[in-house]
């Protein structure tokens, strides 16, 4: 059976379909980005292939649903798959534009993590300067959904903790 966060996807997709969007892009991703932090970088099967569950089990009305298998591990492969996938719905991209978009996204992703680490350093410094406890919240990306996380970060903050994410901790 699907875990609760996976079931939330149905509600999010329904909201998009109700807006009568012409296309929803929700790719299947066997692998997550390899951040060289573990032996592998597989996504959980439910996360990786849930777009197939949506395609097979939801009434999408007239909304096209594009769910190609993609990976960020190989730029050339990513660019080719994206171009081919969007051509199936009569959307055409220039190969060089997709390459630039890929590289820009990877750079922004790296910059985001560098900024996150700096925010962590600032938060720890603040906590030490003010003699506050630090709580590290660990979880999955879907834990950002307030329905899933029950605002535990806000609760911890009201209890006097400085809250940082697992992802922000310098490696």
Predicted regions and their residues:
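An N-terminal assembly and electron-transfer interface module characteristic of large anaerobic redox
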Residues: 1-171
């Amino acid at each position: 059976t699907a875990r609760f966060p996976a079931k939330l996807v149905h509600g999010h997709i329904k909201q998009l379909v109700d807006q009568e969007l012409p296309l929803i892009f929700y790719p299947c991703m066997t692998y997550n980005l390899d951040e060289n932090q573990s032996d592998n970088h597989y996504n959980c099967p439910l996360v990786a292939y849930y777009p197939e569950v949506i395609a097979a089990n939801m009434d999408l009305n007239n909304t096209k649903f594009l769910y190609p298998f993609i990976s960020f591990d190989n730029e050339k492969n990513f660019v080719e798959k994206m171009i081919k996938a969007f051509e199936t719905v009569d959307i055409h991209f220039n190969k060089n534009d997709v390459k630039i978009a890929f590289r820009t996204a990877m750079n922004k992703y790296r910059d985001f993590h560098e900024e996150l680490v700096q925010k962590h350093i600032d938060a720890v410094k603040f906590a030490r300067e003010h003699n506050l406890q630090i709580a590290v919240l660990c979880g999955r990306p879907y834990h950002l959904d307030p329905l899933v996380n029950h605002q535990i970060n806000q609760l911890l903050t009201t209890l006097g903790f400085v809250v940082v994410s697992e992802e922000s901790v310098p490696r």
